[in-house]
Amino acid sequence: MPNIEADRVTSVPENNDCKSKSQPLRNNLHETVKSYSIQGAATANIEPPAERPYPWGCPVTHTKEKFYTICADYAFLNQATSLCKSSSSVCSSSSEDKSALSNTINYIDLQTSESDSVYNEDASLESLSSNLGTRPLAWEIDKSDFSTMTSKLKRSGVKKQTPKKKPDRKAKPLRDCPQHLILDDVKQRKVLDLRRWYCISRPQYKTSCGISSLVSCWNFLYSTLGAGSLPPITQEEALHILGFQPPFEEIRFGPFTGNTTLMRWFRQINDHFHVKGCSYVLYKPHGKNKTAGETAVGALSKLTQGLKEDSTAYVYHCQNHYFCPIGFEATPVKASKAYRGQLFPHEVEYWILIGEPSRKHPTIHCKKWADIVTDLNTQNPEYFDIRHTERGLQYRKTKKGGNLHCLLAFQRLSWQRFGPWPLQLGTLRPEPQPPVQGRRIPKSESEDNVSKKQHGRLGRSFSAGFQQELAWKRMCNIRERRGSGSPESDTDYEGND
């Protein structure tokens, strides 16, 4: 940019040489300024007068320089001033160009001396402010847009915060609910009777998971360790009652231990201790003795209801193993319903707590009911190991179809359900007895364990039939120990605990 201040000395009329040299310089400056003035709109016709030593457009250079200088000095005031000094003729020509300029930029003409010299750059800012007086500065910043934006941001921020307060409003009824109601609701969804865990016979023998699980159920139903009144029994006592002899570590229980075998052993132990009970298959969707018509939803309802009571115990037959369900938890799907009560079935996910008799596994398993249903509904040659769900579906060498896995239920029966048995047996004495040759003893009658005194009251015929039934049971046990076994366990049990 040309420096106009350096050429002020050319205005001295005494130096003719300098005046002759400055004349062509003025013409060049005029041509340059003319190009700036007519750029964008040809609104003014500027001709170079002879008496005009410097063009009016030269202060544009100072305007750009002064703009940044004054902005730095008045930064805290958010104001800036563009200064220039021009003649009256230039003011008239510049007034015509104001329509083409922006409304935010205004030029202020300063009345100083009559000489056409540019405002002195070394003048102090204090003298500048005194000359301006009360006139507004040329450069002002409009903050209205910023204020509207900040107000919009505040409003939008308030709108975003309103949804966060909605969960608090919904949570108010939970706070107002009595504490005992919340406790009762949680108890219905989280069930674990510690007595069932106390009765788990752990550890087991190498392959005695079947009899160990059965002893666990029996102790819970009939012993003082659980919900009964009899002394608890051990695995060794139960094996002795069933006719097994030590050493028990050498017995291979796998080949002759099946679902029906456990139910028969349960009846024999009950007969030995003169207690009443029954056993049945709760849920077995495929294979022999399947529960036709039973669904997974119905089986889950019966299982959870039975675990809340103390009159029923369960055994779960899974891949090469038996163990006992002892509790459950109905976990809500949504976190906001952790302490809600009376949830719908689709709002919860059931987990079954299973006691483990083997010391090689955790003492309590927690398995999804959906995984248990998958295990029970898988048919050969596919199988699903519930204790190793990470392995997924696996295959074994066996014939297609069927599945031995199931849920077994063992229930304690009270004497009152069958009436006063001692009085009923006493009234049977005067009744005439049919001859021994023509009378057949029903199976249900032979399974009821009656004391020796009651046998004498019933007569010699009943006593003889009862002894025949016991002899038949012993023969069955001997055959099972020789390896004939249960047909259910031949293709399932591999000798692992």
Swiss-Prot record:
* Family per similarity comment: Belongs to the BIVM family.
**What would be one Gene Ontology cellular-component term for the protein?**
nucleus
Annotated region (Disordered) at: 1-24, 150-173, 426-462, 478-497
Feature: compositional bias, Basic residues = 152-169
**Name the UniProt record assigns to this protein:** Basic immunoglobulin-like variable motif-containing protein
Compartments where located: Cytoplasm; Nucleus
Q: Does the keyword Cytoplasm apply?
A: yes
Where does the chain cross the membrane?
A: none
* Biased composition annotated in UniProt, kind: Basic and acidic residues: 442-451
The species is: Xenopus laevis (African clawed frog)
Q: Which UniProt keywords apply?
A: Cytoplasm, Nucleus
